């Protein structure tokens, strides 16, 4: 299926780019190109001396990026956790003026049944961001134990019925001639295993999220990107990060908070504020930003988005 038919509305477009405080001649990284909404807006704010490097794991995102004919722009087919390697290869370590990350799954990925991310559309159970490498969700489910699956569902989906669902999935795969291979097939098995239904949320929501996060090592990728951001950024370089679920947002929030706190010193000790702040690597910029009611109405998928911004000292 050609995913160009799937409309993608970039979430918190202006807020995330404004958070970078773009310098016209600066060097920026869009770590999650997607369909290019943030990248195109960044390019519109750069002078001829400015530069934008984008990364993405999705081959279809790379194809979209290759349609941008602009000498200031380049795309690299890799995960955003590899940004330090990209910068090192380009001689840009410590010279980046801003990094933007828009975490999670894009609308084209969700809406294309062939990608296997959605429990609302029937398609092959894939879920890989990069379809050129790694195990698909179906391949992993065919070999996972009930205990390991329950751990994934609990850890990455905060699923209260993790053990029941895991047992149902593994039992089905052991007894059936044909193992689970379709999205709606898995969604139905999960729905049948859940004893209490939330009328506001599909019973497979948390399980699909958890399996997707595990298959793509999403939290590991984010952890690596956060830990390396300080070495990549130039002084006063900005981090602008949009997350879509509590696990991601908690990681981003804790990272920014931890790296923006000074030393704990005894009360009354004569020490200058400049000395206290000398070894604080980050400054948090403003409060967390959520989509407006108007944006949520225009794009309901933006509802859970949270934007956090920080600046390297």
UniProtKB/Swiss-Prot annotation:
Nucleus is among the record's keywords: no
Catalysed transformations (reactions): cytidine(1402) in 16S rRNA + S-adenosyl-L-methionine = N(4)-methylcytidine(1402) in 16S rRNA + S-adenosyl-L-homocysteine + H(+)
Location of the protein in the cell: Cytoplasm
NCBIfam families given in the database record: 16S rRNA (cytosine(1402)-N(4))-methyltransferase RsmH
UniProt protein name: Ribosomal RNA small subunit methyltransferase H
Coiled coil: none
Record-linked Pfam families: Methyltransf_5
Gene name linked to the record: rsmH
Family annotation (SUPFAM superfamilies): Putative methyltransferase TM0872, insert domain, S-adenosyl-L-methionine-dependent methyltransferases
Source lineage: Bacteria, Pseudomonadati, Pseudomonadota, Gammaproteobacteria, Pasteurellales
């Amino acid at each position: 299926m050609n995913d160009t038919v799937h409309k993608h509305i970039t979430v918190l477009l202006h807020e995330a780019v404004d958070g970078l405080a773009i310098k016209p001649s600066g060097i920026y990284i869009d770590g999650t190109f997607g369909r290019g909404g943030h990248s195109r807006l960044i390019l519109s704010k750069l002078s001829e001396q400015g530069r934008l490097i984008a990364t993405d794991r999705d081959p279809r995102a790379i194809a979209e990026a290759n349609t941008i004919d602009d000498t200031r722009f380049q795309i690299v087919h890799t995960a955003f956790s590899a940004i330090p390697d990209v910068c090192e290869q380009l001689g840009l370590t410590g010279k980046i003026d801003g990094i933007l990350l828009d975490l999670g799954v894009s609308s084209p990925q969700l809406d294309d049944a062939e990608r296997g991310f959605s429990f609302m559309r029937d398609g092959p159970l894939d879920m890989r961001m990069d379809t050129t490498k790694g195990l698909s969700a179906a391949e992993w489910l065919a070999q996972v134990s009930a205990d390991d699956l329950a751990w994934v569902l609990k850890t990455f989906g905060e699923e209260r019925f993790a053990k029941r669902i895991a047992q149902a999935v593994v039992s089905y795969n052991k007894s059936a001639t044909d193992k689970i291979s379709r999205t709606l097939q898995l969604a139905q098995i999960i729905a049948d295993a859940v004893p209490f239904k939330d009328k506001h949320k599909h019973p497979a929501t948390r399980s699909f999220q958890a399996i997707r996060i595990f298959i793509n090592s999403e939290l590991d990728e984010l952890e690596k990107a956060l830990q390396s951001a300080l070495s990549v950024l130039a002084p006063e370089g900005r981090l602008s990060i949009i997350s879509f679920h509590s696990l991601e947002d908690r990681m981003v929030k804790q990272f920014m908070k931890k790296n923006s706190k000074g030393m704990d010193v005894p009360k009354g000790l004569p020490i200058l504020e400049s000395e206290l702040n000398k070894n604080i690597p980050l400054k948090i910029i403003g409060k967390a930003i959520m989509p407006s009611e108007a944006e949520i109405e225009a794009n309901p998928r933006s509802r859970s988005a949270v934007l956090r911004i920080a600046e390297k000292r």
